[in-house]
Amino acid sequence: MRTLEDSSGTVLHRLIQEQLRYGNLTETRTLLAIQQQALRGGAGAGGTGSPQASAEILAPEDTQVLQQATRQEPQGQEHQGGESHLAENTLYRLCPQPGKGEELPTYEEAKAHSQYYAAQQAGPRPHVGDRDPRGAPGGHRSQDEALRELRHGHVRSLSERLLQLSLERNGARAPSHMSSSHSFPQLARNQQGPAPRGPPAEGPEPRGPPPQYPHVVLAHETATAVTDPRYRTRGSPHFQHAEVRILQAQVPPVFLQQQQQYQYLQQPQEHPLPPHPAVLSHGPLGALSPPEVEGPASTQTSSAPSGSAHLAQMETLLRENARLQRDNERLQRELESSAEKAGRIEKLEGEIQRLSEAHESLMRASSKREALEKTMRNKMDSEMRRLQDFNRDLRERLESANRRLASKTQEAQAGSQDMVAKLLAQSYEQQQEQEKLEREMALLRGAIEDQRRRAELLEQALSNAQGRAARAEEELRKKQAYVEKVERLQQALGQLQAACEKRELLELRLRTRLEQELKALRAQQRQAGTPTGASGGSPELSALRLSEQLREKEEQILALEADMTKWEQKYLEERAMRQFAMDAAATAAAQRDTTLIRHSPQPSPSSSFNEGLLTGGHRHQEMESRLKVLHAQILEKDAVIKVLQQRSRKDPGKATQGSLRPAKSVPSVFVAAAAGTQGWQSLSSSERPADAPARLATDRAPEEEPVAAAPLPAHAKHGSRDGSTQTDGPTEGASACLGLDPDSLLGYSGGQRTASLDSVAASRVQDLSDMVEILI
């Protein structure tokens, strides 16, 4: 609806603009009143007036024409509304108020009229006849420019029907106004014959212009030549324009008369020549004058005896011409206004058609909307009725549910009271039972504490018994170790006693054999000394010498036996101490193992695996350490064996002594051990210088040959290690006596000699290994 109001307001505005351009003052006032009323009525509603209101205010004849005509859209003239309104106001102020049936001038006429009055008020203008016809004064330059623009303007051509209607209505008053129309040449041919009105002019006949001065009308001379009958062509399209009409109609009569008289007096008094052809071709206003003007001109040239008669005739002609011109202009204005009204009516019809179509579309849309609203209202009513029924059912259900709930709550309250009484009785009974159970639990806790104390006492007694058992086991192991030691010592003692007995037997046999050999040697010496009588004192000397040597050797043997017993005692003590230390270490390790096993946690797969790894690592380390110890022992024993082998190679060369008397109380094993020990000690101790040549001599002598008795060194007595005895001679004497070569003394065979040497070497190695272990 807003768009319809806007469009109606736009249509009214266009109508007012067109009426201001082309209509009369009455219709303009009517449309302005309609617009003002629409503006006052639409100020509250926010829009312009409706087309119905504007149509009601129009005149009745306008409404009839509005219903029959069609609308024509304006051709780009909407922007001239303000200018046309201003021109209309100016025209209303300048022109007198016309009557009811009088036509008002158009916008272009009012504009030209206002320009004319502005020029009159600006200052005195030069007379039109005072200037040259060919000149171009500056006073009429604005009118010339307006005419120049009119040449390029649009020419309004009317339809034949409208022209015939206007001619039928106004044909009696203006029969000669269409004489020279270019649009309707048949009218011009029919109206060329009427005679001029008015009395025939008296006086001399006026002459026309000379042939060398053609009637050429320029554009700037149009304003002065408009009222001249020679230059008027009413059918020309240029004279049909509004500005030309305003110049023809609105010039004051006094000014026109003065101008016409001045022009007429200045014309030459000659007969008019036929019009030059150039007159028709120069300028838009160059056309033939009408016959009613040409007639008086011919009469003026023929008969004008005096100037006054001529002037009177001219005045009558001018008045008639002005009257005809006014009638023609009025008819033209009526024709133009009717054409403009027809165009406006067409535009109004088109706009009304468009408004009616919009109204019909709006009505259809509103009918559709109303139908849709009706259907939606019906749907909503049905939905509301359905919801009301549903709400009623729900309310009934709610009431029934509330009633049932109230009855149930009452029943539940009664049942709950009974249940509460029962629960109270049950809770009292349960409290009594709970008190009984608590007393029983207190008794059981006391019994459990007694049981726990008893268990602790039993565990303590068990731990004490286990400790006593462990200590008893340890003591038992120690006693068993002592028993084993005693048994081993007894076995060793028995073995030593057996060895001593065997050694004593061997020594007895050797002693007896040596005594026998000694006796044999003495007998040989006697037999050898008898032949030589001269040397009677030599046997005595040899006997004394031998007795001294024997005594020295016995002393040496005694000293060696003492040393041997001392070292044997030390060896036994050291061996016993070593055995005791080994047993103590074994018992400590066993006890440690038992404590570890006892205090170890319960075995688990992971802990057993870790313990297996740890025990394996410990065993591996123990084996490595044991291997290292054994390797060191082997190296030491190898070194001792090498030393003993060297000494054994040296010992046989020193066994060059006579018969020895071994001690009966010294076992043979101890002798061998003492000999080995003495030989081993002799490596570290410093030997006497006197023993060096004897040892070197024995080293050079071969083992197979019998060695003769070496000369005895000087007696250099020195104390032994323990200081018990004093011996003369080197300490190697015992080993030499124990390691005597059987071939040199007893004459044994080679096999017996090697067997005895092997047994002596084996005993030495065994004893030395034991001594090295003890010392380590």
Curated annotation (Swiss-Prot):
Key words of the record: Cell junction, Cell projection, Coiled coil, Cytoplasm, Endosome, Isopeptide bond, Phosphoprotein, Ubl conjugation, Wnt signaling pathway
Q: In which residues does the motif PDZ-binding occur?
A: 773-776
Give positions of region: Required for interaction with CDH5. Answer: 101-307
Give residue spans, biased composition: Pro residues: 196-213
Site Required for interaction with MAGI1 and ACTB — annotated at 107
Polar residues bias: start-end ranges: 177-192, 297-306, 678-687
**Which residues does this entry mark as bearing Phosphotyrosine?**
107
Name the residues annotated as site: Required for interaction with YAP1 and ubiquitination at K-347 and K-408: 213
The organism sits in which domain of life?
Eukaryota
Q: How is it modified after translation?
A: Monoubiquitinated at Lys-347 and Lys-408 by Crumbs complex-bound WWP1. De-ubiquitinated at Lys-347 and Lys-408 by USP9X; the interaction may be promoted by cell contact inhibition. Deubiquitination of AMOTL2 negatively regulates Hippo signaling activation.
What InterPro entries would the database entry show?
Angiomotin, Angiomotin-like, Angiomotin_C
Extract the ranges annotated as region (Disordered): 41-88, 119-142, 169-215, 283-309, 591-620, 677-743
**Annotated region (Required for interaction with CDH1), positions in chain:** 220-307
The modified positions for Phosphoserine read 756, 759
Q: Name one Pfam family in it.
A: Angiomotin_C
Tell me which stretches of the chain form a coiled coil: 314-509, 543-570
Identify its protein family.
Belongs to the angiomotin family.
Q: How does it assemble?
A: Part of a complex composed of AMOTL2, MAGI1 and CDH5, within the complex AMOTL2 acts as a scaffold protein for the interaction of MAGI1 with CDH5. The complex is required for coupling actin fibers to cell junctions in endothelial cells. Within the complex AMOTL2 (via its N-terminus) interacts with CDH5. Interacts (via N-terminus) with MAGI1. Interacts (via N-terminus) with ACTB; the interaction facilitates binding of cell junction complexes to actin fibers in endothelial cells. Interacts with CDH1; the interaction may facilitate binding of radial actin fibers to cell junction complexes.
Task: Give the protein's recorded name.
Answer: Angiomotin-like protein 2
Give the species.
Answer: Canis lupus familiaris
Task: Please name the taxonomic classification of the source.
Answer: Eukaryota, Metazoa, Chordata, Craniata, Vertebrata
What gene is this protein a product of?
A: AMOTL2
